[in-house]
């Protein structure tokens, strides 16, 4: 259990850094004597020291089920060790990924610096020279969960998931944390300058400015045009309203020269996602070419039971 306590400390640190994890996003795990301890679906890494967030699963059973294409691997509910897990914890949607990678520790983060490359049409070519010397792999976009795991060939120490985020794997927590930091430094991008403007005509009753970067005009266009990573779509919808195209009371309104306007009653999870949207968009250059989700990819995510479950949890809507 000392290792689990250490994982909790690391998870809380990662979850408290908005440039690495937002709300209930991301997941972490450690393998210990045939047990896979993995963050439960919908739980916040930032709260790892305050409440039980890790589900215990029977690792040999998961690996056997994966080898036999058992449909139970879609949720992994059947492999939960009820004698070790706190009641009500549902395995992470990425449990098969955590189980199938051979390294003892796996950290999956929604690193803003990584996402700012991963959402680009030429993202793989962009990150290749920056990650030179590391054992890494680019993984084309696939719906999270079991389909994503099936696209991975184990053997790398880090994986850049197109339109999604970063996974690192190591045999110790220290090595995994160091690798997250290394990737963040190598992939860091500057914030694009935003014009300074008067808030007159932008401020709206029932809204406030998010604690996030101000956006350049091209960043507003990019962010409004569609969704390009899962949590953006699931918690904010496809794209975002702009100040000159507002209908009703959308959760987020974008205006050039300002951070996102967020509704006063916005729940904690979409509020965090609005900040992440700005953090990513503010790093995109005018000549970048974002790759947005297709209509089918959006449908597959928004109609997936795992995401419907996450949306149903307190603080998500």
Set out the residue ranges of the language-model regions.
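Glycine-rich flexible loops
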Residues: 1-317
